[in-house]
Amino acid sequence: MPPYRSRTTTHGRNMAGARGLWRATGMKDEDFGKPIIAVVNSFTQFVPGHVHLKDLGQLVAREIESAGGVAKEFNTIAVDDGIAMGHDGMLYSLPSRELIADSVEYMVNAHCADAMVCISNCDKITPGMLMAALRLNIPVVFVSGGPMEAGKVVWEDSVKKLDLVDAMVAAADDHYTDEQVKAIERSACPTCGSCSGMFTANSMNCLTEALGLSLPGNGSTLATHADRKRLFVEAGHLIVDLARRYYEQDDESVLPRSIATFSAFENAMTLDIAMGGSTNTVLHLLAAAQEAEIDFTMADIDRLSRRVPVLCKVAPAVSSVHMEDVHHAGGIMGILGQLDNAGLLTTSIPTVHSETLAKALDHWDVTRTNSEMVHKFYSAAPGGVPTQVAFSQERRFDKVDTDREKGVIRSKEHAFSQDGGLAVLYGNLAEDGCIVKTAGVDDSILKFSGPARIFESQDSAVLGILNGKIKPGDIVLIRYEGPRGGPGMQEMLYPTSYLKSKGFGKACALITDGRFSGGSSGLSIGHVSPEAAEGGTIGLVREGDIIDIDIPNRKIHLAVDDATLAERRAEQDAAGWKPAEERKRKISTALKAYAAMATSAARGAVRKLPD
């Protein structure tokens, strides 16, 4: 049996000094020998998705100690992508994922912790902690802060649901008065929690359920609802049990790499495609798979995208449906149940809470079980009261939405689309692939051709859109915004929001080697690989070049002959792969260090050290 890692610092005469320090943290004689569990929190007052986590770490810690473990809490950083959006702050968002993963590794290995409970929530925090968990491969349970309630505003004598994107779109639309914009702004984000649609944060928290590393309901139970407290209480007890099974019973099946296997990654990506998740999840799953030493690639994502239907449409794809509605329909277990019915999942694999995913679905899928507890759990409703307090309300719907024909979650037979919610496109513009969230693309523009309007940065693209330089039929091309070229691979939520505000949501396309917010919709193609800074063809496009986009056939083509491209490449090699226009962008030492090691989006934008 493997010894408890913590014995390195708690046993033996030579560890008297270390034990003295442990005692100064509150440990007593009877604690030496118990599993030491790291409570990896991410509380910060900067981020609404994390503002309520301060007390939740201690809640988990108390449950760990009541179950016979020793809990030691620390915090990681957390960047709010919405606040960092639209300025140089966004350069730091994706690199923060690596910093979070490293900081978890540093703390856990430096102090020889035996296991972890990861309390995450927003965009880069869950992926960073996931990467660390698979890197360390010690028992872990994920429990996130939960989604925000959707905002509501009275508009033209009716109640309209809102989210963060509505505020951005309205602010750029001259048809809205200042008073209307303020009303939307004040109502869009009413509570603590991760932004209310199927944006990156909620997508990733949902995927932890499919990977088997979190409890049912983790991705969909509202941050404000009292039911969410149970997840934190159970996580504290569960992690002590997992630690004992591994260290005392030599049960390796509880380790994250035994749970998050290749099949589990397939399940997670299948879920992502079916629910129209954020394109950022592709980056994060690819990165996490590399930490787990699993050969899960863009080719696998392409393969899955061709056979998985869209079973659930959530904001930004459908403005009236938010995470609270997904939970009301049975949550992630409800979607996984329909995917299983369609034969699209591997359910023989374990989870942290069940022997197999199949057994978990039998217990938690509301269309399979008559359990009053399960149906009550998924009837949790929004409270409708602005608050930053977790577990502060107990409202419920009268019954769960089990309609799989016209409800929020559909069966394969009644899918929103038999074609998946994400697609990988290949062609001479993206030899290693690029990603489009097809769930947010109108059917009328699944095939699109138009002239490229070149912008060497997100900033210049925003100015171009707002100043009327884009017209219907154009393709906005933003380059040198990849992991290395940005650096940091900025999200392009403002350009897509402004195109929508100008009425071009179905009339233009946007292509970039950067990435998109989970809140983006429309014909938005990102993650173009190789990126411009790596010598990708996107760096050779000239103003007015025609680009052909064919989503049904998974193609993207720059209509320039090979000989001309070769001439341009020779010119660019001589000039250097850098933006044609100087950018007023201060690149710090920290960002330069990230850029020096960053790989392309096709590899998850992970760092690669020189040989």
Curated annotation (Swiss-Prot):
Lineage: Bacteria, Pseudomonadati, Pseudomonadota, Alphaproteobacteria, Hyphomicrobiales
Cellular compartments per GO CC: cytosol
Residues recorded as bearing N6-carboxylysine in the entry: 124
Catalyzed reactions: (2R)-2,3-dihydroxy-3-methylbutanoate = 3-methyl-2-oxobutanoate + H2O; (2R,3R)-2,3-dihydroxy-3-methylpentanoate = (S)-3-methyl-2-oxopentanoate + H2O
Listed name of the protein: Dihydroxy-acid dehydratase
Record GO terms (molecular function): 2 iron, 2 sulfur cluster binding; dihydroxy-acid dehydratase activity; magnesium ion binding
Biological process per Gene Ontology, one example term: isoleucine biosynthetic process
Keywords tagged on the record: 2Fe-2S, Amino-acid biosynthesis, Branched-chain amino acid biosynthesis, Iron, Iron-sulfur, Lyase, Magnesium, Metal-binding
